[in-house]
Amino acid sequence: MSQFSFTKMHGLGNSYIYVNMFEEQIREEDLAIVAEKVSNINTGIGADGMILICPSDVAPVKMRMFNNDGSEGKSCGNGLRCVAKYAYEHKLVEGKVFTIETLAGIVTAEVTVEDDKVTLAKIDMGAPRLTREEIPMLGEGETPFIRENFLYNNHRYAFTAVSMGNPHAVIFVDDVENAPLTTLGPVLETHEMFPERVNVEFIEILNDEEMNFRVWERGSGVTQACGTGACAAVVAAILNGKMEHGKEITVHLAGGDLMIAWTEEGNVLMKGPAEIICRGVYEYKIEA
């Protein structure tokens, strides 16, 4: 029987099991199955996935993120805010501004602190990727951004493809509460045009500074929030002329609000909370 200490944290209800790999050990070949086991709501702790906080050669810390199906993702906005909180409060970093390595690249985090506890974290997510190769997405044609139609259930849905280190398909609807989240979501997620699968967002524009947001995450399904998805949604809204560069946009997710801005300089900034749920020790056994 193996075990490790964990901290369960969430960003707007998007919860992960966080493991401090400066202190704990999990075999590389076991990571996918451990992520699946620990995320199981019935036989594990229950979460949207597992995130490892690891040593890095290029930053104070490195984040590795696994979905609850065991697949490894390249980035996670809500996860980054929680990693920033954990790293600061456990003195893995120096100062309130620091970098975090991800599989999608290095990002900069800035934390707001009250009584030695992080209450908010702002992440510079870098510039969005908009080409088919960067997303990645199969097909022909290279326009300034990809906007395509997808026929589902005799209805044509237009989506805008954006990568924030992971792929997103953003669909604008009149009412997110009646959007085909659990039907179109998994169909588009696993469509062959997306070789690495895709996260699917449904967006309802409220005004030039607010939007409602619902998400079907690849590898996890419906979640309360998706930080990279909120970033992709704001980018897509600006690309489609629905919002403006430089403004801070309030994104209303099922789990709460994020503040997102696509700056004139080209980077996307995300600001929001990160909270601890519980701590403990998880025991597991890998069948031979």
Curated annotation (Swiss-Prot):
Could you tell me which InterPro entries the record lists for this protein? DAP_epimerase_AS, DAP_epimerase_DapF
What is its EC class? isomerase
Q: Which GO terms describe its molecular function?
A: diaminopimelate epimerase activity
* Catalytic residue positions: C76 (proton donor), C226 (proton acceptor)
Ligand binding (substrate): N14, N67, G77, N78, N166, N199, E217, R218, G227, T228
Q: Name one GO cellular component term.
A: cytosol
Q: Which Pfam families match?
A: DAP_epimerase (PF01678)
A GO BP entry is: lysine biosynthetic process via diaminopimelate
- The EC number(s) attached to this protein equal 5.1.1.7
Q: Which reaction does it catalyse?
A: (2S,6S)-2,6-diaminopimelate = meso-2,6-diaminopimelate
Question: Which residues are annotated as site, described as Could be important to modulate the pK values of the two catalytic cysteine residues?
Answer: H168, E217
Q: How does it assemble?
A: Homodimer.
Q: What is this protein called?
A: Diaminopimelate epimerase
Instruction: Identify the species of origin.
Output: Bacillus mycoides (strain KBAB4) (Bacillus weihenstephanensis)
Q: What is the lineage of its organism?
A: Bacteria, Bacillati, Bacillota, Bacilli, Bacillales
